[in-house]
From Swiss-Prot:
Function: Catalyzes the decarboxylation of four acetate groups of uroporphyrinogen-III to yield coproporphyrinogen-III.
GO MF term (any one): uroporphyrinogen decarboxylase activity
Annotated protein name in UniProt: Uroporphyrinogen decarboxylase
Keyword Cytoplasm listed: yes
Species this protein is from: Pseudomonas aeruginosa (strain ATCC 15692 / DSM 22644 / CIP 104116 / JCM 14847 / LMG 12228 / 1C / PRS 101 / PAO1)
Length: 355
C-alpha cells in the first residue's frame, strides 16, 4: 500500500509525538457542503449515494479538497447498512429520517436474522473503502466505522429513530434474553463488518454508540459496553504493517469513561458535555481522547470559534493523545467557511502544545 504522507491522526491515537493536534470532523462529508448536495442530487437519494462506490468516494474526498488542514478521511456510509443487510428493509422518509419495513419484536425474529457477510452482503461498502484508499493515495488515513450493537438494536426494535426508546427498553427489561440474543448477533455482525473494512483498507475504525447514553449505568455496562468489548476483542489490530486503532464513542457516556477505557480501544470519543481536561486526568494514561467541541459553536463567528478551540486545547494541555473533533456531527446549516476557520484554528493554536 502507498505510504502515508500525513499520519499525525494515527500517531495521536497511539500517543506518539505529533507537530500539531490532528483534526477531523464527524459528518465532514455532509449537507453543509454545496458540493455534497450536488453529488447527492446526482445520485438521486441518500441510499443510492451510499451504494455507489464512486460517488461515495467523491463525497468522502470533497471536504479534503476544500480543507487542506483535515488529517483524516472517514468513509461515507450509514450505520444502518448492517440491519439493512440483515433484511430489515431500510428506507428514508422525508423529514422522518431512517425507517425499517420490518421490525424485530420477538426471539423468533432475532433467531431468523442472518449475520451479513461483508463482501457478499455489504460489498458496496467494501468497494467504497477500496476506491477511497486508491484515490487518497496516502494523503491522509481512512477511518472505517459502524454503529454499536445497542444503537443498531434500537433502530431495529423501534423501526426507526426514537426519542424515548420505549420498545427497546421494554424488551431490555421484559425480555433480556431476547435483547441479549439480538445484541450478540449484532456484535458478531459488527466485528465481521469492521474487519472487512480493515481488510479493504480502513486504517482506523470508530464504533458509534449514539444511544448508549440513554441507558442507566447498570444497563449501559450489560447491554452496550459488554458488546463493544466483544467487538474490540475480535477486531484485526495489525494490518499492512501498522496498528489499526479503535475509537469508542458513546454519546452521553462521560460518566463511564473509566469502564470504557478498560475495553481495549486506543481512544475514546467525548461529547461536548465532558470537560476534556478532567477526562484526561481520569483516563488519559490509558487512552487517547477525541473531541469535543459543541457542534453549535460553528454557528458563531470565526473569532468565537477560535476562542473555543483555544479553550479546549488549553484544557487538554501539553503533549499528544488528543484528536480534535466535534462532540457530535456537524449540522447541515453551518457555513462551510466556519468549518474552515475551525480547522485552521486547531492547527495554528495547537503547535505550542507539542514539541
Amino acid at each position: 500500500m502507498t505510504a502515508l504522507k500525513n499520519d499525525r491522526f494515527l500517531r495521536a491515537l497511539l500517543k506518539q509525538p505529533v507537530d500539531v493536534t490532528p483534526v477531523w470532523m464527524m459528518r465532514q462529508a455532509g449537507r453543509y457542503l454545496p458540493e455534497y448536495r450536488a453529488t447527492r442530487a446526482k445520485a438521486g437519494d441518500f441510499m443510492s449515494l451510499c451504494m455507489n462506490p464512486e460517488l461515495a468516494c467523491e463525497v468522502t474526498l470533497q471536504p479534503l479538497d476544500r480543507y487542506p488542514q483535515l488529517d483524516a478521511a472517514i468513509l461515507f456510509s450509514d450505520i444502518l447498512t448492517i440491519p439493512d443487510a440483515m433484511g430489515q428493509g431500510l428506507y428514508f422518509e422525508t423529514g422522518e429520517g431512517p425507517r425499517f419495513r420490518k421490525v424485530v419484536s420477538s426471539l423468533a425474529d432475532i433467531e431468523a436474522l442472518p449475520v451479513p457477510d461483508p463482501e457478499q452482503d455489504l460489498g458496496y461498502v467494501m468497494d467504497a473503502v477500496r476506491t477511497i484508499r486508491r484515490e487518497l493515495n496516502g494523503r491522509v488515513p481512512l477511518i472505517g466505522f459502524s454503529g454499536s450493537p445497542w444503537t443498531l438494536a434500537t433502530y431495529m426494535v423501534e423501526g426507526g429513530s426514537s426519542k424515548d426508546f420505549r420498545k427497546s427498553k421494554a424488551m431490555l427489561y421484559d425480555n433480556p434474553k431476547a435483547m441479549h440474543a439480538l445484541l450478540d448477533k449484532l456484535a458478531q455482525s459488527v466485528t465481521s463488518y469492521l474487519n472487512g473494512q480493515i481488510h479493504a483498507g480502513a486504517q482506523a475504525v470508530q464504533i458509534f454508540d449514539s444511544w448508549g447514553g440513554s441507558l442507566s449505568a447498570a444497563a449501559y455496562q450489560e447491554f452496550s459496553l459488554a458488546y463493544m468489548r466483544k467487538i474490540v476483542d475480535g477486531l484485526i489490530r495489525e494490518h499492512d504493517g501498522r496498528r489499526v486503532p479503535v475509537i469508542l464513542f458513546t454519546k452521553g457516556g462521560g460518566l463511564w469513561l473509566e469502564s470504557m477505557a478498560e475495553v481495549g480501544a486506543e481512544a475514546l470519543g467525548l461529547d461536548w458535555t465532558c470537560d476534556i481536561g478532567s477526562a484526561r486526568a481520569r483516563v488519559g494514561e490509558r487512552v487517547a481522547l477525541q473531541g469535543n467541541m459543541d457542534p453549535s459553536v460553528l454557528y458563531a463567528n470565526p473569532a468565537a470559534i477560535r476562542a473555543e478551540v483555544a479553550r479546549i486545547l488549553a484544557a487538554y494541555g501539553k503533549g499528544t493523545g488528543h484528536v480534535f473533533n466535534l462532540g457530535h456531527g456537524i449540522t447541515p446549516e453551518v457555513d462551510p467557511a466556519h468549518a474552515g476557520a475551525f480547522f485552521e484554528a486547531v492547527h495554528e493554536l495547537s503547535a505550542q502544545y507539542h514539541g
